[in-house]
UniProtKB/Swiss-Prot annotation:
Glycans are attached at residues 79, 179, 274. Disulfide bonds join 429-476. Disruption phenotype: No visible phenotype, excepting a slight decrease in neural conduction velocity from the tibial nerve to the somatosensory cortex. Mutant mice display impaired motor coordination and balance. Sciatic nerves from over three month old mutant mice show signs of Wallerian degeneration, with redundant myelin, degeneration of myelinated fibers, axon dysmyelination, and an apparent decrease in the diameter of myelinated axons. The distances between neurofilaments in myelinated axons from over 3 month old mice are shorter than normal. Residues 1-7 are cytoplasmic. Its EC number is 2.4.1.92. The lineage of its organism: Eukaryota, Metazoa, Chordata, Craniata, Vertebrata. This is Beta-1,4 N-acetylgalactosaminyltransferase 1. Most abundant in brain, liver, lung, spleen and testis. The chain crosses the membrane at residues 8-25. The gene is B4galnt1. It catalyses: a ganglioside GM3 (d18:1(4E)) + UDP-N-acetyl-alpha-D-galactosamine = a ganglioside GM2 (d18:1(4E)) + UDP + H(+); a ganglioside GD3 (d18:1(4E)) + UDP-N-acetyl-alpha-D-galactosamine = a ganglioside GD2 (d18:1(4E)) + UDP + H(+); a ganglioside GM3 + UDP-N-acetyl-alpha-D-galactosamine = a ganglioside GM2 + UDP + H(+); a ganglioside GD3 + UDP-N-acetyl-alpha-D-galactosamine = a ganglioside GD2 + UDP + H(+). One of its GO terms (molecular function) is (N-acetylneuraminyl)-galactosylglucosylceramide N-acetylgalactosaminyltransferase activity. One of its GO terms (biological process) is motor behavior.
Amino acid sequence: MRLDRRALYALVLLLACASLGLLYSSTRNAPSLPNPLALWSPPQGPPRLDLLDLAPEPRYAHIPVRIKEQVVGLLAQNNCSCESKGGSLPLPFLRQVRAVDLTKAFDAEELRAVSVAREQEYQAFLARSRSLADQLLIAPANSPLQYPLQGVEVQPLRSILVPGLSLQEASVQEIYQVNLSASLGTWDVAGEVTGVTLTGEGQPDLTLASPVLDKLNRQLQLVTYSSRSYQANTADTVRFSTKGHEVAFTILVRHPPNPRLYPPSSLPQGAEYNISALVTIATKTFLRYDRLRTLIASIRRFYPTVTIVIADDSDKPERISDPHVEHYFMPFGKGWFAGRNLAVSQVTTKYVLWVDDDFVFTARTRLEKLVDVLEKTPLDLVGGAVREISGYATTYRQLLSVEPGAPGLGNCFRQKQGFHHELVGFPSCVVTDGVVNFFLARTDKVRQVGFDPRLNRVAHLEFFLDGLGFLRVGSCSDVVVDHASKVKLPWTAKDPGAETYARYRYPGSLDQSQVAKHRLLFFKHRLQCMTAE
């Protein structure tokens, strides 16, 4: 018995040593762990680019500064790169980062040509999307001029009163004078004050002068700006000056946002929300009609009259018999995101719930909770959780970011698990950037982002990348849908449709769809690489 115990102890010790050896082997080339208190540590390797923004003004050049490397490291370096981390063995207690170099989807000659074309398209995009409202303006110190910092807006070819203009001059002067200058519009006054001289009414440059400061300020309250150049969404940087002082502020020139409202619906007795009137369930199916019928049957247990929209690109489509199902057929193998676009295009309700065709509704699939979140918060989309046959449920909460790269190389896309913060008022919900393939969203917002039909095989997070900075995304772990089991019992008959589905859904290593996706991301989003952890 004693020998058996000794053998057991020796075996445990041997396993422990082996584990430590594997840990050392996988981490000996990795950078050392950062200080727990540090948010960032400078990367090992080539020195970073000089930060020109830290250069002093000439009058302050003689003053020494001690640079705080940890804080400087938090600033954009405009020189991003993607590197895998965590060693070759996927140990559960080590941070794993997978990196993909999108440039590998091109040969050298093609990469040079496509990079030039991409940069040309990028510059054209900047010209279209930027306006003077994006220009940095610095307010001067101790200026006697009072003016609006922001919030001045006019519709194209319309006129407004300009609020907040005033001269707060402390010294007594014989004549108080101010000047206004614009580039996309003209100045005028809605009324004339006796004792104030106006020069340039109806012109881009207007001068106002008076020996009485109060009269000048009363006249400034009546100044109007008129948009004279039709541009649907731009800004005019205007100048406001007096003797020895000049300031600039922007006047936004754009149409006000046009609302897309949905009429309120009557509530069923005792219900908080009329789900059938508020929500349409959308799905994309391909060959798996047994799974699709199981999904529909599970939905009908809890929501018997909610509309279900199906986009179907199967080779031999089968009819679905249900009075509240809209079944739309597509060319065979048209694609995953193309089907999403078709399904969402037919939704007429305020919200659309996206589900996979192999999901199963249960008592925990409470759409009322997701509707409540969107009704009471500014979120545009909220995901739930998907429960596997093992009992494990995932929300697939993802934090997404794009870091600037060196000129001409493109940016770096970062993806990691997590969330930004909890959603106030909803204890099981958080704010994040990407969620699992089970979400409720505002229909008009999903349409504005859209699903790129060029992604026809495997895609999901690309939708959230397209919506990054536009879609406000949340996730709730207490609204759960089941995922049908993928386990194939050996005694069941072979399903030719399932084999065809697997070839399309899970492309092999030699399949070109993954390369095509990398080429698309390289050009479309001006990316050079991406990492996931």
